[in-house]
């Protein structure tokens, strides 16, 4: 009888166990990359399998067109402009005491810890570089990675990789492209600036302690993620894996460079090596979940933090206009995938607009967690299981300094002035013009007025930036 009671208790516990949550975040991966997005040049079978076994969102957005602000929205479930987080700390300004996710904001990890989850982050943080903002003080039980905006995958002297770096001036003077005698180091002036000093005062950390990492960083992040799954397979866990791939610096591991010898453009070949490496890493995480019999009790999200910076990396946003840093579709619409085997239909293409804010709302609903503060996202599960046939969002909003946009239904109004330009508004109908080539603002002035009014109404609920960007 005692054995039967124990067996019953264990069985009930397993049945009622909360689902694990795995959030895989690529860095600077454009909408036009991935096999499941229609690009067959660089095979990505493991990432594609998430779409095959679940849902691919054709209109998946993020809350900002660059790294830090986008992550602030993702991890709080609220438009980051609600709490004044609007820009990107870079270089030494990651250490500014005010340049971090406000301590008043609860992260997804904070909420899930209180719901009984073990939480881990392995990769890039970029939500504050000082001790107050360290992930282990923001709800994460474990952290392995770095705090700033970027990091070398392999530090100088760049062993085992081919490295492409930006330079304002080539070694010896001049512009164009310079290649070392062994063909393993390339400098290019095509961007007109020099590669940031990513690793300065930005060590790899385990919790709060610096460690030396001899392994290519994508592989190291994956190693730590797999270890986390191994050690926590018997409890609900939240695994957040913000890869720094395919963010610069461009560094392709030798084994992956060989796979893409057919790509003649060396810049594109390095990018391909980095993306394929990340795909294999995602595959290793998925395989670990399968080997632990966790796949059917694990919700998996995959998305990018913003659109691709095409000139810098070759990261494609096709067929969308422009890319990272802009409020055109190429800056805000990203690869966006979700899997929960046995719970949401597989091979699903979901065509209504969703946004990264929804991952927070979905996750806390699955965790049966409580949060008093209102969220800007929605639980996606009812929409993917046909319990709710409406649209998750009628209106989406963006503000990035003087760049701003609103999407309402199929209409999008935006202002994307370059430095020194005055504020002007452009209007596009996205169903008819996904590439935003036909500005309809002069023909539909009533629609411009309507959307301006809606943007102003939403913006009135936001606050001014609590800190301003600085350059080194």
Set out the residue ranges of the language-model regions.
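Formylglycine-dependent sulfatase
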Residues: 14-426, 430-472
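Sec-dependent signal peptide recognition
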Residues: 1-6
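N-terminal signal peptide c-region/cleavage motif recognized by signal peptidases
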Residues: 9-11
């Amino acid at each position: 009888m005692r054995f039967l009671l124990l067996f019953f208790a264990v069985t009930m516990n397993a049945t009622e166990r909360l689902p694990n949550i795995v959030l895989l975040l690529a860095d600077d991966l454009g909408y036009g990359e991935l096999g499941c997005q229609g690009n067959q040049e660089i095979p990505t079978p493991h990432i594609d399998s998430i779409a095959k076994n679940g849902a691919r969102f054709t209109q998946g957005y993020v809350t900002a067109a660059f790294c830090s602000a986008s992550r602030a929205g993702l991890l709080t479930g609220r438009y980051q402009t609600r709490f004044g987080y609007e820009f990107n700390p870079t270089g030494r300004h990651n250490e500014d005491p005010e340049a971090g996710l406000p301590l008043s904001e609860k992260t997804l990890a904070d909420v899930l810890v209180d719901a009984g989850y073990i939480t881990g982050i392995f990769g890039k943080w970029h939500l504050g570089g000082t001790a107050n903002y360290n992930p282990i003080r923001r709800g994460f039980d474990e952290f392995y990675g770095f705090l700033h905006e970027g990091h070398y995958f392999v530090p100088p002297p760049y062993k085992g990789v081919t490295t492409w770096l930006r330079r304002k001036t080539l070694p010896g003077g001049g512009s164009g492209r310079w290649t070392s005698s062994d063909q393993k180091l390339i400098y290019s002036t095509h961007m007109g600036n020099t590669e940031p000093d990513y690793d300065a005062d930005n060590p790899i950390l385990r919790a709060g302690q610096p460690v030396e990492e001899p392994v290519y960083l994508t592989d190291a992040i994956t190693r730590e993620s797999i270890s986390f799954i191994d050690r926590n397979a018997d409890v609900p866990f939240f695994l957040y894996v913000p890869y720094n791939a395919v963010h610069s610096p461009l560094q392709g591991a030798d084994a992956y460079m060989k796979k893409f010898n057919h790509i003649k453009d060396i810049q594109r070949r390095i990018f391909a090596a980095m993306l394929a490496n990340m795909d294999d890493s995602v595959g290793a995480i998925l395989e670990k979940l399968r080997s632990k019999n966790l796949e059917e009790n694990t919700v998996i999200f995959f998305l990018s933090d913003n659109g691709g910076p095409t000139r810098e990396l070759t990261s494609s946003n096709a067929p969308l206009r422009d890319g990272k840093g802009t409020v055109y579709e190429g800056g805000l619409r990203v690869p966006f995938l979700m899997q929960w085997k046995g719970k949401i239909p597989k091979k699903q293409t979901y065509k209504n607009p969703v946004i990264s804010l929804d991952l927070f709302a979905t996750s806390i609903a699955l965790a049966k967690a409580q949060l008093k503060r209102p969220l800007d996202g929605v639980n996606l599960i009812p929409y993917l299981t046909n319990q709710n046939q409406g649209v998750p969002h009628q209106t989406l909003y963006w503000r990035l300094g003087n760049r701003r946009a609103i999407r309402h239904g199929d209409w999008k109004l935006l202002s994307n002035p370059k430095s020194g330009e005055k504020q002007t508004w452009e209007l596009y109908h996205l169903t008819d013009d996904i590439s935003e080539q036909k500005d309809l603002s002069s023909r539909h002035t009533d629609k411009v007025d309507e959307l301006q009014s809606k943007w102003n109404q939403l913006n009135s609920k936001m606050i001014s930036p609590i800190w301003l960007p600085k350059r080194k």
